[in-house]
Amino acid sequence: MSTTTAGILFALSLALALAAVHVPLGDYMYRVYASEKHWRAERVAYRIIGADPAAEQGWGSYARSVLAFSAVSILFLFGLQLLQGRLPLHLNDPATEMTPALAWNTAVSFVTNTNWQAYSGESTQGHLVQMAGLSVQNFVSAAVGMAVAMAFVRGLARRDTGELGNFWVDLIRGSLRILLPLSIIGAIILVSGGVIQNFALHDTVVSTLSGAQQTIPGGPVASQEAIKELGTNGGGFFNANSAHPFENPTTWTNWVEIFLLSCIAFSLPRTFGRMVGSRKQGAAILAVMAVIATLSLSLMMLFQSQTHGTVPTAVGSATEGVEQRFGVADSAVFADLTTLTSTGAVDSFHDSYTSLGGLMTLFNMQLGEVAPGGVGSGLYSMLVLAVITVFVAGLMVGRTPEYLGKKITPREIKLAATYFLVTPLIVLIGTAVAMALPGQRDGMLNTGPHGLSEVLYAFTSAGNNNGSAFAGLSVNTEWYNTALGLAMVFGRFLPIILVLALAGSFARQGRTPESVGTLPTHRPQFVGMVTGVTLILVALTFLPVLALGPLAEGLH
């Protein structure tokens, strides 16, 4: 069996597994967020934080709760990192100094669900920071995205009200009822597959084949690895991330990790369909995600199987930066889905991909990570694109556009259009400023088109809250730590504010009855329109800079 055939079978098995859990997991998440009962542990949490679970919030109050919780989380994680040398389970001789700029960048990164890492995890962060800081944020940052998605869906489903639910209820339920039990199951599976789970620091010394002594770092890896993937976080315990054999030792664990990073995002459309009272609407959104993901994965595997240069031609594929235990095809599947979602974990190194393979990782993020996107963020991003599509279709036939019985007035389309413009502006302005400053260009280890691609990738990853990187860019500097931190903050919270404002606007409307001129939003025609609008908008926005970077490199 050829490696390409094996890779196709690998991808098909993942698709079948995701299809199998789509309905039960989507229905379970619907029951979690629709339930009127509170667990005892949840009631304790409400009392601790002083929240009234029976109180509904409008979009402004919901947004303020999101921002307040995230701000406190950033401050806590920032302080924990700077003080870790005085706390238990710290590293005695960290390889990288934890400066305020790096602590800021890391705190923002994990709170925004980006998990961009400008440091080597196993030689910089102690176990207490990994467990009480980074792992906790892996849970709650994912739960925040899911909460915002549920608030937006309620805005579409409800009428004549300004209430979108309760952020604190959504946050705690998402963490305790969905992410925690699934991550426990995932961690047990990963441990059984060989992922380590211990409290060893840097005190395990072994003899190498040549007789030298080597220190092997350990830690509670499996427990962090499960939520790292499940919550589409992506920050690795080790610098090599999921390419490290302690995080991802076999093809089986590789398959499990890809499944974990995809399952919630691909199941949320089912939850959406149940909440709006039409499973067909959820199926249509899922179909858009599946079409884009299939196109992207096909191109990624094609480009990574291309052979340019003496060594790739002799080997038969582009193997640089690829772990041989996974192979090119399986690594391409991981790379594609980690950038289609907001995960950013890697089992191979994207900077070593072919120019067009690297282009696909960039383009996937520039889509807004909507196919399926991050947990929660992918769903609300796709629904905003659906709103834009309905508006465009309404212009074509000369009717007031409607989506799920809600009219799209000038206020709604302004919010949706602004939502779409935020991230491209962050990415393009950040890249332009970095390229214009001579001091920042010194951090580029490559010149020419690939050097531009590395800077573009950094700001694309930060602005879209992905976290993966083209590693040929030295980013642990005060400027990059600050600039990329700001890109992560604005790229996370400006879209959240806009999507909650849009949800509040929809919730205040009544329901408009369907008429002969209403565009059906559950048919293949609509699926094709949303797919087309998504691809065209992204192509028009980013094609010029992609032409200067990976496309120019590919032509060269």
Swiss-Prot record:
The keyword Cell membrane applies. Pfam families: KdpA (PF03814). Coiled coil: none annotated. One of its GO terms (cellular component) is plasma membrane. Keywords: Cell membrane, Ion transport, Membrane, Potassium, Potassium transport, Transmembrane, Transmembrane helix, Transport. The chain crosses the membrane at residues 6-26, 65-85, 133-153, 176-196, 249-269, 283-303, 378-398, 419-439, 483-503, 526-546. InterPro entries: KdpA. GO terms for molecular function: P-type potassium transmembrane transporter activity; potassium ion binding. It is a multi-pass membrane protein. Its main location: membrane. It is found in: Cell membrane. It comes from the Bacteria. NCBIfam families: kdpA. The system is composed of three essential subunits: KdpA, KdpB and KdpC. Part of the high-affinity ATP-driven potassium transport (or Kdp) system, which catalyzes the hydrolysis of ATP coupled with the electrogenic transport of potassium into the cytoplasm. This subunit binds the extracellular potassium ions and delivers the ions to the membrane domain of KdpB through an intramembrane tunnel. HAMAP family: KdpA. Belongs to the KdpA family. PANTHER family: POTASSIUM-TRANSPORTING ATPASE A CHAIN, POTASSIUM-TRANSPORTING ATPASE POTASSIUM-BINDING SUBUNIT. This is Potassium-transporting ATPase potassium-binding subunit. The gene is kdpA.
